[in-house]
Amino acid sequence: MKKALAIGLATVMAVSMSAPVFAEDEGKGIAKEDLKVGVIYIGDENEGYTAAHMKGIDEMEEKLGLDDSQIIEKTLIGEDEGCYDAAADLADQGCQIIFANSFGHETYILEAAGEYPEVQFCHATGTQAASSGLSNMHNYFTNIYEARYVSGVVAGLKLNEMIEDGTVKEDACKMGYVGAFPYAEVISGYTAFYLGAKSVCPSVTMEVKYTNSWASFELEKECADALISDGCVLISQHADTTGAPTACEAAGVPCVGYNIDMTSVAPNTALTSASMDWGVYYTYAVQCMLDGTAIDTDWCKGFAEGADKITALNDKTVAEGTEEKVKEVEDALIDGSLHVFDTSAFTVDGKELDTYKKGDTEYISDGYFHESEYGSAPAFDIAIDGITSITE
């Protein structure tokens, strides 16, 4: 498939001498052969989060029958003014739709969207598209909290096995979580993971430490080591490298990864990973360009649409009966009989929540927190009982 282009290599593809064709021209779609797609990545193929996005772009290209030359990718683009420069360069090269994959890119993508109103800008994990007033600005994410919950069930079953065989005492059943930043995206994810584990292992608690970086192998490894030293008997992560699983493999501690299958670095300890199929969105958005139809301002899909999942269970490490339980939980998520943030499943300072508002939006109704229903980005940022978050 295509090779990712670093920002310094933008000259590889010459700027088109003809005026670009846009999906909004008289409501007509773009002819497939005229389409150009730009992608801005925070990392590269060596970092799991970006690798998952690259896989999604490849999937979109294959499904829609595009050519490698129609996809221009820029890797290692930081959350700074260089992101605007990358977006402007892609627009100047004739890209009619541009994707950016990191939370901190949003300010600069908004700036570019204002400067290039005929180009569609799609930003992953962001929050400002709806309020920006820009019709060409879009946010997208997946219901990754669902996959976090399911991977938590896998972890909880492993903890039960460890309790039963005497490896862990029931009253000392503590998980550790390597978080990137104390943002709602991370809090939502680790809370869902914890609730999944707690649904099958009621005595579990969890400790969270932050690296304050989306992707740092050394910091993630150090953080996992510190959690293990604090008595955590199973580790998960919302951080983008293999640092935490590497630490777990060395220590013989079970782990649940993120973005990609971690068995290549932790064959004896990895259980599964929470993962997203970004190809579902990329295919949808680019198909909209071809059809001349509007792209959703906020897009978020989950298990039912195949947008998030857990990676293959590691038969070498998971507890007996895990596959059957996972199927049961996934089916319940898909048919709507299970809600990850069911308020009867957690307390805050010993009390069950019946209301939680952000601005004028009430997130709790019908007995659960309605995650990602009022915007694509996660909103759950509540500190619940059973989880200790260390932000130092």
Regions found by a protein language model. Give the residues of each.
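A residue-level marker of the well-folded mature domains of exported/periplasmic proteins
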Residues: A23-E392
